[in-house]
Amino acid sequence: MLSNIVKKTIQSSKNLKSLVLNKSTSSLVYQKRFLNVHEYQAQKMMKSYGINCPVGNVAETPEEAEKIAEVMNTQDLVVKAQVLAGGRGKGIFTSGLKGGVQLCSSAEDVKKFASKMLGHTLVTKQTGEDGKVVHQVYVTERHFLRKEMYFAILMDRKAGGPVMVASPEGGVDIEGVARDNPSAIFKEPIDIMIGVQPEQTKRLAEKLGFSKKNISMAQDQMKKLYDFFIKNDCTLVEINPLAETASGDVLCMDAKLNFDDNAAFRHPDIFKLRDKSQEDPREVKAAEFDLNYIGLDGNIGCLVNGAGLAMASMDIIKLYGGSPANFLDVGGGATQKQVTEAIKLISSDKKVKSILVNIFGGIMKCDVIALGIIAALKELSIATPLVVRLQGTNVEAAKKIMEDSGLRLIAADNLDDAAQKSVRIAEIVSLAEKSDLEISFKLPL
């Protein structure tokens, strides 16, 4: 598995949601983990722990949504598109509908909006231009809120455990609050050996501005959220907003939950909720072969062993003016089959114009890498130019295997050389495609 640090760094480059709570470098960062559940799933789980959430139900058709609204028997309704991405409220559907969260006053309204959401693609600032297809909508009761606040529990590497993070400015982009008004962010580190303490939750409840009569209720909800976080091996429990309603209730209006994939064996029921249709299919495919893959936006594919070397390879590609198309770590002991599948995966990305293979053989043997590359090239007739830099165990055997293969592999002896060749080739291929030209490369470059 990727380390949290590597995942955080890579996913930040994908413009995924991350939170830095200090002006300077902070260790308080959360990121998308292996499992991220839908809002309706999150609220169902939370309710079983006594956490207050709005009444609601999920629908997969406009007719189901209408029936749910009829049963709720109220004119104060909300229909929410269910996608694993933030920014729904300001998103745009391929149907032309603006906003993935719509207020409704009747069951007919709910059906109308559900029909414009279900089966359509929602594009938000977090989905990228491809967006995500909506397969469910969540129909809930609407509440009139007296005050909206932000509350989260996440893992803090610096503190060595969980920390509660809260702000009186909820219902908005919390990253913007942290950037523009860091004094509005409050933190309470938790000693995992004794758990969250009443004085901690009271301090936060008072700083958030709960009315005096609701301080104890807010404390109770914070304690239950912490219990949920610990018992389910969460990496993030985010409530935005945590609200005080006009009727005097304390409600978790919207929830984002992430679970530690390393604890999947302890929570099979939770991990069955994984919605692969909302994930990058390349990442799903990579997981089948125990490959650590994260798709990016560039045009230079990367196949590397070791997360640190992979990060360095991506950095040097950027240094020479290129842009990596992915992070792919085959690990320290990959098989020929894994290498073959890694090459297939990278080459399946139409944006990729060149591929950099950078292997330092320790436990991983260079000849295994060479055999995997050749197998993939022969099986798929891959035309994408490959720049291969190998060093370490069995490197001479690997070079001979590649020379004897008769395939047009571009060799490099050091990382600078490999990166420069990869960037140059990607530029040439991109220009040729724009000009509708066919090109070939004469070796050595």
UniProtKB/Swiss-Prot annotation:
Q: Which organism is it from?
A: Dictyostelium discoideum (Social amoeba)
Q: Which gene carries the instructions for this protein?
A: scsC
Entries under SUPFAM superfamilies matching the protein: Glutathione synthetase ATP-binding domain-like (SSF56059), Succinyl-CoA synthetase domains (SSF52210)
- Name the HAMAP family for this protein: Succ_CoA_beta, Succ_CoA_betaA_euk
Describe the family membership recorded for this protein in Swiss-Prot or TrEMBL. Answer: Belongs to the succinate/malate CoA ligase beta subunit family. ATP-specific subunit beta subfamily.
Give GO cellular component annotations, separated by semicolons. mitochondrion; succinate-CoA ligase complex
Which reaction is the catalytic activity of this chain? succinate + ATP + CoA = succinyl-CoA + ADP + phosphate
Q: What is its EC number?
A: 6.2.1.5
Enumerate the Gene Ontology biological process terms. Answer: succinyl-CoA metabolic process; tricarboxylic acid cycle
Site note Important for substrate specificity, residues: 76, 144
The taxonomic lineage of its organism, from the top, reads: Eukaryota, Amoebozoa, Evosea, Eumycetozoa, Dictyostelia
Q: Provide the function of this protein.
A: ATP-specific succinyl-CoA synthetase functions in the citric acid cycle (TCA), coupling the hydrolysis of succinyl-CoA to the synthesis of ATP and thus represents the only step of substrate-level phosphorylation in the TCA. The beta subunit provides nucleotide specificity of the enzyme and binds the substrate succinate, while the binding sites for coenzyme A and phosphate are found in the alpha subunit.
Q: Where does ATP bind?
A: 80, 87-89
Give the quaternary structure.
Heterodimer of an alpha and a beta subunit. The beta subunit determines specificity for ATP.
Protein name per UniProt: Succinate--CoA ligase [ADP-forming] subunit beta, mitochondrial
